A protein has these predicted regions:
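Extracellular/periplasm-exposed beta-strand and loop segments of Gram-negative cell-envelope proteins
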Residues: 39-64, 87-119, 148-166, 174, ...
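Short glycine/proline- and aromatic-enriched beta-strand/turn motifs that initiate or cap beta-hairpins
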Residues: 25-88, 244, 248-251
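Transmembrane beta-strand segments that form the barrel wall of outer-membrane beta-barrel proteins
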Residues: 183-197, 222-223
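Outer-membrane beta-barrel strand-turn architecture
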Residues: 75-77, 130-134, 177-181, 210-212, ...
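Predominantly the C-terminal beta-signal and adjacent terminal strand-loop region
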Residues: 198-251
Length: 251
């Protein structure tokens, strides 16, 4: 799956909701970037027989740049449909102090290792604004998330990779508090926990309205989650320092 496909889904959703459009409508473009770091990235593949490794603890990693883009369509004031493309790819290097079984390949102790962790996320969201006050809004919705992921280890002519393409539903939420004429607090995200695993992607940010069309944001995002089953054990945590801009285009 790639960005053009998710945009086609968004266009289809917009066509469907336009059929019921009777009033206010707005397009919003969110552009987000900044610096991120790994909190932890723990892996055991296969889940029932591989070696437990902490990529961030046992190998070297550096802060990395990131970017995200989201396109939203709000209609009838309370309904919002959006698509998000959130790529993530991190590299680690170093050596393990023991033999490592990863995806049925044995990497001997002290082998120079290059590890790559990719977790691209494509999401389609519908949200309904359940609370609208003069200074406070709250929206609740559902997100369909497609993950395109892999974990790869390579070193000394050895190479092993575990790929994953899957779908998971999440609960979406969006809260704003307009505490002054131009400043607002924003808390939004997608999250869900189940016996098979969990996922949380939450942003807390301070927003400043330049005018009716442009907002700038600065804040903190946490991305955490993983799965635990016979095939894989993988849980990761990433911290994001976020800056962004939101462009509102009335229709």
């Amino acid at each position: 799956m790639n960005p053009p496909i998710i945009l086609k889904i968004f266009n289809l959703a917009c066509i469907l909701v336009l059929c019921t459009y009777t009033g206010f409508a707005q397009i919003t473009l969110d552009l987000e970037g900044g610096i991120a770091t790994t909190g932890y990235n723990d892996v055991r593949i296969p889940g029932d027989g591989g070696t437990f490794i902490g990529l961030a603890d046992e190998l070297n990693s550096n802060p990395f740049l990131f970017g995200r883009v989201r396109l939203s369509y709000t209609f009838n004031e309370r309904n919002t449909v959006s698509v998000l493309f959130a790529p993530l790819q991190v590299t680690y290097d170093g050596a393990f102090n023991r033999d490592v079984n990863f995806e049925d390949t044995i990497f001997p102790a002290n082998t120079p290792i290059d590890a790559t962790y990719k977790f691209n996320s494509y999401r389609l969201t519908y949200r309904y604004q359940v609370l609208t006050r003069e200074t406070v809004t709250l929206g609740i919705g559902i997100t369909g998330k497609v993950r395109d992921a892999f974990i790869r280890l390579e070193g000394n002519e050895l190479r092993s990779e575990k790929t994953d393409l899957g779908f998971v539903p999440l609960i979406n939420f969006h809260f704003t508090w307009q505490f002054s004429e131009r400043f607002h607090l924003l808390i939004e995200g997608d999250a869900l926990a189940a016996p098979q695993g969990r996922a949380e992607d939450v942003l807390v940010a301070l927003g400043y309205s330049l005018n009716d069309q442009f907002d700038i944001l600065a804040g903190y995002r946490i991305l955490e989650g993983g799965a635990d089953n016979d095939e894989v054990y993988t849980f990761s945590l990433f911290h994001y320092g976020v800056v962004g801009v939101r462009i509102h285009l009335p229709m």
